Amino acid sequence: MTAISLGMPDVPTRLAERRKSRQIQVGPVAVGGDAPVSVQSMTTTRTSDIGATLQQIAELTASGCQIVRVACPTQDDADALPVIARKSQIPVIADIHFQPKYVFAAIEAGCAAVRVNPGNIKQFDDKVKEIAKAAKDHGTPIRIGVNAGSLDRRLLQKYGRATPEALAESALWEASLFEEHDFRDIKISVKHNDPVVMVEAYRQLAAQCDYPLHLGVTEAGPAFQGTIKSAVAFGALLSQGIGDTIRVSLSAPPVEEIKVGIQILESLNLRQRGLEIVSCPSCGRAQVDVYKLAEEVTAGLEGMEVPLRVAVMGCVVNGPGEAREADLGVASGNGKGQIFVKGEVIKTVPESKIVETLIDEAMKIAEQMEKDGVTSGEPSVSVAG
């Protein structure tokens, strides 16, 4: 009887049907409709420093970022946009606050899209007609980016604070102004630093419009805290089919935002998984140093892009079962390790040879996958108990 690997299902299970939304184009990247959920980030450089900004965009691109946003608070930043938009490997979105003149500058510069904050752009409502015409003439989508920290004063007076209702109403009101001028090439975000408020705001928004939605928890915090907040909020929404593009906001290097974003999508089967290391958290039953073993295997397989699940287990309780369900695995104990490939034990090796053997077998499987034309995903590492 042929063993079947349960590690990487060919047809991943989805938690809910995707919300039906209109599709827009942010450069070559489709957002909304049936397009895959994309991952984006924002540069931390001064946009006027063209070299540093393009270098950071290159690093983000290499990490899997699909869309990048750049700040544009000054005229020097606006002057840099044409070069950055032209030389960037991925679509560039200009992030505009306060000054409407920079919206027009970004459109003229050839940015793939422009984010506007209706809560703090001077006389924004009066400028919508001009912005809509310029954007339409250039084929430039507009992201209406509502943020709890800069909500329109009229809505703060009405609701008293940035409630889910206030955030959704602000976005829909501004979208309606663009619609009056026959402009619907729009995506929307309603960000809050509280995941519960943010989730409810997006739920309300999703029920009232068909625009693609950009998910984000604003000011999420340092890497650990921000990762938890974003994972909780995005998981709640994406599992209900809500969300078309995501940005994980972290007080950390932008590349870390991409790593977290990709992991979230992989965890929800919204993206092809890459390398996945499944390792037990260790306990008193463990007969090997699981931490060290997992770290060494991870380091040895760094950069592998085929969808391969490798189980590194430290005892006989869950070890054999987890190892059998992975594409490749080891169940350790009594100074040795049983090596499993596709559910079958292929050999038993001394503890000192476990890492070397796992890496060798992983390379063989990866080589065969590549010959078979298996689509590669983004490398990832996860820990399971």
UniProtKB/Swiss-Prot annotation:
Pfam families recorded: GcpE
One example GO MF annotation: 4-hydroxy-3-methylbut-2-en-1-yl diphosphate synthase activity (ferredoxin)
The reaction(s) this protein catalyses: (2E)-4-hydroxy-3-methylbut-2-enyl diphosphate + oxidized [flavodoxin] + H2O + 2 H(+) = 2-C-methyl-D-erythritol 2,4-cyclic diphosphate + reduced [flavodoxin]
Sequence intervals crossing the membrane: none
Gene: ispG2
Keyword Transferase attributed: no
SUPFAM superfamilies, per database record: Dihydropteroate synthetase-like, Nitrite and sulphite reductase 4Fe-4S domain-like
Pathway where this protein functions: Isoprenoid biosynthesis; isopentenyl diphosphate biosynthesis via DXP pathway; isopentenyl diphosphate from 1-deoxy-D-xylulose 5-phosphate: step 5/6
GO BP annotation list: isopentenyl diphosphate biosynthetic process, methylerythritol 4-phosphate pathway; terpenoid biosynthetic process
Protein residues bound to [4Fe-4S] cluster: C280, C283, C315, E322
Gene3D superfamilies: Dihydropteroate synthase-like, Sulfite Reductase Hemoprotein, domain 1
EC nos: 1.17.7.3
Entry's family note: Belongs to the IspG family.
Cofactor(s) named in the record: [4Fe-4S] cluster
Entry protein name: 4-hydroxy-3-methylbut-2-en-1-yl diphosphate synthase (flavodoxin) 2
Function: Converts 2C-methyl-D-erythritol 2,4-cyclodiphosphate (ME-2,4cPP) into 1-hydroxy-2-methyl-2-(E)-butenyl 4-diphosphate.
Cofactor annotation comment: Binds 1 [4Fe-4S] cluster.
Species this protein is from: Streptomyces coelicolor (strain ATCC BAA-471 / A3(2) / M145)
Entry-linked InterPro entries: Dihydropteroate_synth-like_sf, IspG_bac, IspG_bac-typ, NO2/SO3_Rdtase_4Fe4S_sf
Keywords noted in UniProt: 4Fe-4S, Iron, Iron-sulfur, Isoprene biosynthesis, Metal-binding, Oxidoreductase
Matches recorded under PANTHER family: 4-HYDROXY-3-METHYLBUT-2-EN-1-YL DIPHOSPHATE SYNTHASE, 4-HYDROXY-3-METHYLBUT-2-EN-1-YL DIPHOSPHATE SYNTHASE (FERREDOXIN), CHLOROPLASTIC
